[in-house]
Amino acid sequence: TAAAARVGEECILRNPNHRGDEEYCFFLAVTFPASQLRIIDYNRVVRDLNGMTPAEFVEALRTDFEVEKIGGEVYRPARLHNFAMYLDGAWYSLTAREGTYDDDDPIGVLDVTVLSNRVLDKLLDIKDLRTSKRIDFVGGIRGLGELRRRVDSGEMKVAFALYPVSMKQLIDIADTGNIMPPKTTWFEPKLRSGVVIHSFEEGK
C-alpha cells in the first residue's frame, strides 16, 4: 500500500496535466471480517551487536529487561511484553520491566516500540528500521527455526521474536488516528501478488 502510494505521487509529478482521476490515483483495497483475520508475529534479525560481545550485550539488556537464559530449546514469547532472543546458540526470555512502555499510549505500549526504543536504538544504534542495512524482518509464518538458521549461518548475529499484536491493539491505533510502526503485523490470509493487477495506463 505504501509503495503504491509512493508510485502514485511520482506519477503525479511526471504528469503536468494531472486531474486526480487517473488510474495511478487508486490502489487495491480489501476488507475481511476481524473474526476471519489472524495476526502473526513479525520478527527481527540483526547483523551485529554494535561492537559488544554476546556477554556484554546480555548484560546491557538487564537494565530494561528481566533476562532468563532458556538454552537450546526453541522459546516462543508467552505474552505481551515478553520477547524471545536467539544469540550465540542459545534462546533467552526477555521480559520488559515496568516503565519501559506506556499503557496509555496505543503506540508506546506495542512490543515493536519497546524493542525499537530499548534495544535496536538504545543498544544497537539502529535508528531507522526502513533504511538500515543491519536489520531484516522475518514473518512469523516462517517459524522460529528460520530465526535460528539465519543466526547459526553467520549471516546474522542476534534474532528477536515478538508476541503478536492483538486485533484490539490494531483497532485502537486505527481509532485514534495513529499509524502502526513499520513491520509490525503479518496478516493471514494474505493476498497473493499478481492475482489482481491494476494497470496505470489509461484504457487498459
Regions found by a protein language model. Give the residues of each.
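Surface-exposed, charge/polar-rich loops and edge strands
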Residues: 1-204
